[in-house]
Amino acid sequence: MDQYEKVEKIGEGTYGVVYKARDKVTNETIALKKIRLEQEDEGVPSTAIREISLLKEMQHGNIVRLQDVVHSEKRLYLVFEYLDLDLKKHMDSCPDFAKDPRMIKRFLYQILRGIAYCHSHRVLHRDLKPQNLLIDRQTNALKLADFGLARAFGIPVRTFTHEVVTLWYRAPEILLGSRHYSTPVDVWSVGCIFAEMVNQKPLFPGDSEIDELFKIFRTLGTPNEETWPGVTSLPDFKSSFPKWISKDLSAVVPNLDPAGIDLLNKMLCLDPSKRITARNALEHEYFKDIGFVP
């Protein structure tokens, strides 16, 4: 750890404290994540070390680069490139952002590009939210942070500071207890983020797993064997769920054009096997006039 000097604490992530720090060798500013593990006394599990080492191979313009992994005194530190703005802060500080459909389109395109890259390397995110989409103020390049960490460390119910980990972007198959989820869970999260960029408010802000599910079902309809084969066999599906019918998304996200609504419908498909892939979403007609994207 001697190579890095902490400058200031910049936040508390899902897994531990995040510092702005300086690389004493290159003088570069970096983000240093100190990972807090449940079994502090046992040190860092070798599985986590293996998973994290694989992430150093992931290099793409829309992914926050993991530059180094430091294992010292039973603690794990992850060294990332430093970006000081995230999509949540950006949306909160720019009320006019929603009035800029071109910017929303460019951000969405970059999110999907980063995800398609990760999925092509068989890496899931599982915890995508506006707070871990980082933005370079100079170029408006958007980069995904924390990819692959869920697999290495699991997703806690609460952070180490006892904050509740948000459910607002969690896919219905996870909420229904599926153990066999895959890449579609990330596409669902992106659909929620897309709607939030346009509406300037979260689409499904549930405060418990059941509240989250019911918010989803009230808008998209309660699934059944016809609309989602196999859904009634998922561990947490109950035949007693209220049977809501689906609403038209153009009424839910009124400021989005028809091509955008079509793409959103495909991303928010309840049945994960019918949900559009990130790769196919990039080819959607919504992006036909995209022009140059950083």
From Swiss-Prot:
PROSITE patterns: PROTEIN_KINASE_ATP (PS00107), PROTEIN_KINASE_DOM (PS50011), PROTEIN_KINASE_ST (PS00108). The modification Phosphothreonine is found at T14, T161. The modification Phosphotyrosine is found at Y15. ATP binds at I10, G11, E12, G13, T14, Y15, G16, V17, V18, K33. Residues 4-287 form the Protein kinase domain. It catalyses: L-seryl-[protein] + ATP = O-phospho-L-seryl-[protein] + ADP + H(+); L-threonyl-[protein] + ATP = O-phospho-L-threonyl-[protein] + ADP + H(+); [DNA-directed RNA polymerase] + ATP = phospho-[DNA-directed RNA polymerase] + ADP + H(+). Belongs to the protein kinase superfamily. CMGC Ser/Thr protein kinase family. CDC2/CDKX subfamily. This is Cell division control protein 2 homolog.
